[in-house]
Amino acid sequence: AGVSTESGIPDFRSVDGLYHQKFDYPPETILSHSFFMRHTEAFFDFYRQRMLCPGAQPSRAHRILADMECAGKLTGIVTQNIDGLHQAAGSERVLELHGSIHRNYCLKCARFFPPEYIRDSEGVPKCPCGGIIKPDVVLYEEGLDEEVLSGAVQAIRKADTLIIGGTSLVVYPAAGLIRYFR
């Protein structure tokens, strides 16, 4: 989220990050699969307040990366961000390791919903079929999408230059992707 903090998106590990703020539960607990399943309404209260940032606009860094892609100097972006600001800035080849707040799906019928549906619903967002809608983001206790991870490995292997920014490099497996750069 470091690239997005300029856009008003909270990060996790900085002094002002979510991990240093007081909540009823630690953020890493709230953003876990088991918490989502057991305390779904509390999950969505936190998610709406802290993870959905409807007014966020791409930062200068997002725009520079998009301009580099447009100029043919950047072949892709591998990001842990879930905010979609790279795409909003114009980047097209974005691999979102942790998913996106812009995709939400029904756990029962797999129908997709925009983030506004989550934001504007009260309590636990439900599909017309009655199923709970889950953000398409990777929660703690969940694995990364293997197809996205494989795409990231391939993009890094093919790169002749690797720009790393806005990360503490402590979240695995994302932090381990550096080893694929030669």
Predicted regions and their residues:
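Conserved catalytic core of sirtuin-type NAD+-dependent deacylases
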Residues: A1-R182
